[in-house]
């Protein structure tokens, strides 16, 4: 019986998002063309340890998953594998688990493992790499807050979902002269809120990176009223701090020790209603932003990531993460990528353009001059340590 071809493994860790299946499909097709068999490990990193769980992947079995949301391999953001990311807050994975994973790859003749995930999943991948496993990373987060890459797939789809919600809220807000507050995802970074707020015609955008006050938010509503616009759309990232610096959470915990954020939209709506005597409603998109069909941009980006990851394995360039550095797909050490947080720059062209359009960010008028050149800025305000786990 002839020996089987060399194998490449792939897994998806952390929260799901549109585009994961596009990565799996692209990696499988690229591996086939280079003479590899593809194995998909199930339920994230859990599939590497006892009981080992995997299934063969072929171009035929992955032929129809390009437009499918979620991940055919399953995923988990809990379990035995976990690695916190942050200053002095990195959890070491049990050495026995690391050895189980290494043994699994050896016994299955897997020459390289493609790990698709966010900062927490890539922190796990880095520990596997440090243990000697042949690992390559693919970045995934709808928040777009992972350092080392200009964009991650899933982000554009999440923005499209939030933009569609704003389009729909616009008509009902205008009809009933209401203030509508849309809460979107964005734990440490306001990328979704910023892009959706611009694309969906928002009037106020509240971000983790820009301090704001209720007085300025209400002033924007009053300004619109005076101009004959008796409705206002407010977009707020779930990680936007209250004016006193506090984060709003729902009292529970999400992934292991991570505090689950949520509720800032309701607080903003209630405060506006109290201060102005106007009707204000809050809407939370939540996991709707993670589901559904990926946009064309996300399909293209995910496909490029998957193909490039396989080529990194083929070239033996382990410990690297693929990244998008327009216009090229490149790679960067995983350790470097998970060390930095990508946040919205308050002086960026996108923020300046939004201000020029009349969009408010809840900050003082002196800080709201579009296309100003304030000189060097300190780091983003309220920048928390990287304590997320995916």
Language-model features: locations:
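A glycine- and small-aliphatic-rich helix-loop capping segment at beta-alpha/alpha-beta transitions
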Residues: 25-34, 54-61, 127-137, 153-157, ...
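Glycine- and acidic-rich phosphate- and metal-coordinating loops
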Residues: 281-289
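Short beta-strand segments
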Residues: 11-12, 41-42, 74-75, 115-117, ...
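Short, acidic/small-residue loops that bind anionic groups at enzyme active sites
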Residues: 35, 39-42, 128-152, 156-159, ...
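Accessory alpha-helical/coil subdomains and C-terminal extensions
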Residues: 104, 115-117, 123-127, 134, ...
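Flexible loop/turn connectors
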Residues: 302-314
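A cross-family phosphate/adenosyl-ligand binding-site feature
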Residues: 1-13, 21-109, 116, 120, ...
């Amino acid at each position: 019986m002839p020996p089987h071809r060399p194998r490449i493994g792939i897994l998806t860790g952390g929260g799901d998002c549109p585009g994961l299946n596009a990565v799996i499909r692209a990696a499988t097709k690229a591996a086939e063309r280079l003479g590899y068999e593809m194995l998909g490990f199930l339920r994230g990193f859990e599939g590497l340890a006892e009981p080992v769980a995997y299934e063969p992947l072929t171009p035929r079995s992955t032929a129809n998953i390009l437009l499918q949301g979620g991940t055919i391999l399953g995923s988990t953001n809990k379990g035995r594998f976990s690695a916190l990311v942050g200053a002095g807050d990195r959890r070491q994975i049990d050495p026995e688990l690391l050895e189980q994973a290494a043994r699994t790859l050896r016994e299955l003749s897997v020459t390289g493992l493609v790990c698709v995930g966010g900062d927490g999943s890539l922190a796990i991948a880095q520990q596997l790499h440090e243990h000697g496993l042949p690992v390559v990373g693919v970045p995934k987060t709808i928040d777009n807050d992972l350092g080392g890459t200009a964009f991650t797939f899933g982000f554009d789809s999440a923005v499209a979902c939030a933009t569609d919600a704003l389009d729909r809220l616009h008509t009902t807000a205008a009809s009933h002269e209401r203030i509508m507050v849309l809460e979107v995802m964005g734990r440490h970074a306001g990328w979704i809120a910023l892009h959706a707020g611009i694309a969906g015609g928002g009037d106020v955008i509240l971000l983790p990176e820009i301090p704001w006050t209720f007085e300025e938010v209400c002033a924007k509503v009053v300004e619109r009223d005076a101009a004959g616009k008796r409705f206002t759309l407010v977009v707020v990232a779930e990680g936007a701090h209250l004016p006193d610096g506090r984060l709003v959470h729902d009292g529970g915990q999400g992934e292991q020790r991570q505090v689950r954020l949520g509720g800032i939209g309701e607080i903003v709506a209630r405060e506006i209603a109290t201060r102005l005597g106007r009707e204000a409603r809050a809407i939370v998109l939540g996991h709707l932003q993670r589901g559904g069909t990926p946009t064309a941009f996300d399909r293209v980006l995910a496909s490029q990531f998957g193909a490039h990851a396989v080529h990194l394995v083929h070239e033996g360039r382990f410990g690297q993460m693929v990244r998008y550095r327009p216009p090229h797909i490149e790679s960067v050490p995983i350790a470097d990528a998970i060390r930095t947080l990508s946040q919205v720059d308050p002086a960026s062209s996108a923020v300046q353009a939004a201000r020029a359009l009349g969009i408010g960010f809840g900050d003082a008028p002196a800080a709201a001059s579009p296309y100003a050149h304030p000189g060097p800025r300190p780091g983003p305000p309220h920048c928390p340590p990287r304590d997320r786990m995916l």
